[in-house]
Regions:
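Short, basic/aromatic recognition patches
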Residues: 2-24
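Short beta-strand segments
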Residues: 17-47
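Short, charged/polar surface micro-motifs in flexible loops or helix N-caps
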Residues: 35-36, 47-50, 91, 101-103
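General beta-strand recognition
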Residues: 38, 93-95, 133
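A short, polar/charged loop-to-alpha-helix boundary motif
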Residues: 47-61
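Conserved small/polar residues in nucleotide/adenosyl-binding loops
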Residues: 123-130
């Protein structure tokens, strides 16, 4: 199913599916809702999970804590039905567009795992201008 990585051009411009798994054998997966386009979760797949996802048209991920493939929603009933799979230009990240109906994706019960909002103004770095202090360069 997955092809050997032969050349950069073939990977970036060709039709070969040749995912680049990291040193732990994983590839990151961003999952979004096909209807609302909201980000549902970030997960990981190993080779087996990726193949099962393609074959079954339902999302399978690698659980880094349990060290096993899990069929998303098998226990909760909120199966992620695959509508589209994309892989990025150098094939080291995957994007799933899924249908979850009215279900949730987060293991704590929320529709999206990204349910927390961080007020960005509280976490911005001071601009370099603010860090200069009160001395201005002298003009000659």
């Amino acid at each position: 199913m997955f092809k050997k990585r032969e050349s950069v051009t073939e990977i970036e411009e060709g039709n070969l599916l040749s995912p680049k798994f990291d040193n732990d054998g994983l590839i990151p997966v961003v999952t979004t809702c096909v209807n609302t386009k909201e980000i549902l979760m970030l997960g990981y797949m190993n080779v087996d999970a990726f193949k099962k996802t393609i074959e079954t048209k339902e999302a399978h991920y690698w659980s880094r804590s349990r060290k096993q493939v899990w069929h998303k929603g098998k226990t909760s009933g909120f199966i992620q039905k695959i509508k589209e799979i994309r892989i990025d230009d150098d094939q080291d990240a995957v994007w799933l567009s899924v249908d979850i109906g009215n279900g949730s994706s987060c293991h704590v019960g929320y529709r999206s795992c990204f349910y927390r909002s961080i007020p960005c103004l509280l976490y911005t770095s001071p601009s370099p201008r603010d860090q200069r202090g009160s001395r201005m360069p002298s003009s000659a």
